[in-house]
Amino acid sequence: MSQSNPLEIRSDRDPLYGWIMVGVVFILSALAFGALGSISVFLKPLATEFSWTRAETSLGYTAIALSSALFGVAWGFVADRFGTRWFGVIAALVMTASLYMLSKQTSIVHFYAFYFIYGAFGNALVGSPLFANVAYWFRQQPGLAIGITAAGGAFGQGIVPYLAGIMIEGSGWREAYMFMACGYLIIALPLGFLVRESPVRLRAMQFPDDQPRTFPLKETEVLIWLSAAVLFCCNCMSVPIVHLVPLLTDAGQSLSSATSVLMVLMFSGVLGRILGGKLGDVIGPLPAYLLMSLGQTVFVLWFPFTENLVTLYVLAVFFGFAYSGVMSCILMCTRMMVSPGFAARAMSITSFFGYGGMGMGAFVGGLLFDMNGN
C-alpha cells in the first residue's frame, strides 16, 4: 500500500475558515499599518511643538520600520515552529498600549521608544507571520486571497491617517493618539482571538522533512534575490508615504486636503493589492511583480512637479495602485518559491529588507528636505 503525502490537501475546496482569516488579518493589518502611515500626519504638529527637525521626526517611522524588521524575523522563526495562534491578541494589546503612551510623550526619546515597541510587538506580529498563515489556507486562487489580505494595510494607511488628521485638527495630537488607542483596543482585541493556523502549515510543523516544493532555485538563493528587490522597491515607495502630507501642506494645501490625497493613494492601493494578487494568479507572480514595480518607479517621479489638487488625486490613484500591487506580488512570489514550513521565516526575512528600505527612504526624504528646504 502506498503511503500518502502528509502535506497533501485532500479536497479541492478551500476551508471556509480561510476566508474568515482573510477578514481578520485584513483588519488587523489595516490597524497596524494605519498607525505606521499616520506618522506623516503627526509629523508637523510634533515638530512644531517640540522644535524637532523633519529628519528627527521622520525617524519615528524609521523606528517602527527597524523594529518591525528585526523582530519580524524572530517572530517568523516562532511562527514556523509553534504557529501564530496568539499573535493577534499580543499585537492588539501592545498596539493599544503604545498609542496610549505616545499620547503622554514628552521627549523625542519617548517618541522613538514607543514607536519601536509598537513595531516590535505589534506590527511585526500581524505582518509576515499572519500573511504566511493566510497564504496556505488556499489552494484555489491563492493570489486573490493574499491580495485581499494585503489590501488591509493599504486600507488602513488610507483611513487611519485621514481620521488622525481630523482628530488632530479638532482636539490636538495628544487626544488623537488617545482616541486611536481606545479604537484599537475595541476593534483588534476580539479579532485577535479568532486567529487559527492553516491546515497545511500545521502539517508542515508535524512533518518538517516532507514538504512539497517545485521551484528550481534553493530557498536561500530565492531569499537573496527577493530581499534585494524588496529593499529598493520599498526605499522608493516610503518617500511619498511619509512626506506627501508635509509636501502638500508646505505648498499651501490644508491638512485635510493633504490627508485626503494620501487617503486616495492608499484606497487605490486596496484595489492594487487585490488585483496585483489576482494578476499573479493569471500571468504568474514574478511577471506581475515586475510590472507593478515599473509602474511605481514611473509615477513617483511626478509628485514634486504636480501642484493642482485634481491632478494630485489622479497621480495618487496610479501610484497607489502600482506600489500596493508590489506587496501582493512579492508575497505570491515567496509562496510559490519556498516550502510551507519555511514560509513565515521567508516572508519575515524579505520584510526585514522591505522595512529597511522604507526606513531608509523616510529618513533620506526628511534629510534632503532639511538640506534643501523643499
Where are these regions (language model features)?
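Interfacial helix-cap and linker-helix signal at transmembrane-aqueous boundaries
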Residues: 46-47, 78-79, 159-172, 176, ...
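C-terminal transmembrane helical hairpin of 12-TM major facilitator-type secondary transporters
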Residues: 237, 257, 263-275, 280-333
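C-terminal ends and interior cores of transmembrane alpha-helices
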Residues: 93-106, 295-307
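Extracytoplasmic gate region of multi-pass secondary transporters
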Residues: 39-44, 219-278
